[in-house]
Amino acid sequence: MPYEKIVSDSFDDMPTPFTYASDRLFALRGNKHKPVGLILLKNISEQMMLMTNYKRYKEMKLVACTNVFEKKPDVQFNACTFLLPDGTVVVVFRGTDDSLRGWKEDFDILTQDNIPSQKLATDYLEQAAQKFDGDIIVCGHSKGGYVAQYGALFCKKEVRDRIKCLYNNDGPGFSDYSFIETENYKEMLPKYKHFVPQSSFIGMLLCHDDDYEVIKSKRITGPLEHDLSTWQISGDEIKRESGLTDMGKFNDLIMYHIVDGLDESQKAALDRALTADLDGTGQVGLLDVKDNAIAAVKGLVSAHDKIDKATQNTLKEIFADLDKGIASTAQAVRKGEFKTVKQRIKK
């Protein structure tokens, strides 16, 4: 929820009680449960208000609800710090929102080694640690899980030592395996939990650990399972699965195959094309695209047609290899060679 509309982005301001912030935000939204853009359905608002009735959440406080939204470079960064009654400091990073810039930054994870949100996450975590004493929990969902992991790995040693738990909820991996071979990663591993649904798509992107815990979702496809509200609960426990489905294994291998197969010039071409296409829509968010679908599609097509010839030829090369990759990956999963292929990739 957009608590940044209620809570200051400064660590120097007084923390705001969770119940007060939630009531104010609900009132700001007309005292009605409404979706937040096209992605977050109205159930997120319903859950927020239900939480205000439970003792577990009532005494929490919020501080430094930060929202950074920029273009060139594309940045969509959101973070908030929750202060628990026992003194624990919970630093939460939000995933991708409704904005097209946010989605572009997601694509940047695939084509660039560094994105602005990585440094923003590291700096934010260090500020929270400097301001408050106590154990620290770091967590996030989707891109939020990705930057939570990055911030926890690359913050100062004295901050890492205070981290009690690091939770990555179906967030993607890094651009290469060197990140998870660092001493920082090995140091953090006993505190680290990576949760993914059984047919995970986002959580299988790029180079990630294989120590993830598989969660049972009510849905049956990766993108739909990415919604945390579909993850099943039994009492106070999350329902686990013994492993990924074949679809989840396919997603893991094919996404790494596609991205790892790109050279630097191909990544640059893909980046230029995505930037041109998204700018061409003339829209700010996904809801705007939905409401102005005809104009958005026309703008996108027009912008894509204007992409230079060399870039278009490079895009054709990229997608020409896609069929082969899909076929070989599907065959590997069918033959039960998932672990063998994964070991080969890591080498």
Q: Which residues are covered by each model-predicted region?
A:
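Short glycine-enriched nucleophile-adjacent loop
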Residues: 148-157
